[in-house]
Amino acid sequence: MSSQELVTLNVGGKIFTTRFSTIKQFPASRLARMLDGRDQEFKMVGGQIFVDRDGDLFSFILDFLRTHQLLLPTEFSDYLRLQREALFYELRSLVDLLNPYLLQPRPALVEVHFLSRNTQAFFRVFGSCSKTIEMLTGRITVFTEQPSAPTWNGNFFPPQMTLLPLPPQRPSYHDLVFQCGSDSTTDNQTGVRYVSIKPDNRKLANGTNVLGLLIDTLLKEGFHLVSTRTVSSEDKTECYSFERIKSPEVLITNETPKPETIIIPEQSQIKK
């Protein structure tokens, strides 16, 4: 086949047309083997080579094949997924090029919304990382007072209150809610909700005390308080924002990138 001939790829439903010479820029890649018929995973369907991969990310890969440069939007964040695609196509230099971006520290964010109303306190915790919310869910226990059945032993004894442990509610993977303080039960009796946060064994009903313990827990997990504000002037909900800089868990080490491969931020390009 002539290097000037065109090839059409269907990658995840997106159509790309390029030259054979572009695909063969990296002879050791799976894309080059695809043209030689040496890789059976790529099938010819209706005159197009079908590839069951991410079409949106392939546009960056094809641009890299054409220019030996990686041009990414300023808001791009899917470095791990893009590197996974580069590994699939066995584009070693692109894999190496993405490594520094995977090694950059990324902040984990937490927001604590706190509302104190009369003798009740309400908490809602948002987290950018679901694992942080899972950690807090495993540590926080809400205890509700439940009256036990009255006992008879010649004389009547009033029902005793027992504590029923409950986990905080999880509206989504990224938040949890709970409350403490007085609690109106279904029989119009007033009980109390207590909150315990491991490893502290205390059962606290005062909202301010629970807030202090929750903040202390986040600080011990490496978070830093970055701001406080009032979310709503009507109900005076307080918001405490925390941040933790932590390297990503998935780290891949490869050879040094080739000197001819560079990343150019999109905003630095001159649009034609």
Swiss-Prot record:
Tissues/organs with expression: Ubiquitous in normal tissues and expressed in some tumor tissues.
Cited Pfam families: BTB_2
Function: Inhibits potassium fluxes in cells. May regulate Kv1 family channel proteins by retaining a fraction of channels in endomembranes.
Subunit structure: Can form homooligomers. Interacts with KCNA1 (via cytoplasmic N-terminal domain) and KCNA4.
Cellular compartment(s): Endoplasmic reticulum
Organism this protein belongs to: Homo sapiens (Human)
Cysteine disulfide partners in this protein: none
Domain BTB: start-end pairs: 5-106
GO molecular function: identical protein binding
The gene coding this protein: KCNRG
Cellular component GO terms, alphabetical: endoplasmic reticulum
Stated name of the protein: Potassium channel regulatory protein
One of the GO biological process terms: protein homooligomerization
Keyword terms of this UniProt record: Endoplasmic reticulum
Predominant location: endoplasmic reticulum
SUPFAM superfamilies: POZ domain
Lineage: Eukaryota, Metazoa, Chordata, Craniata, Vertebrata
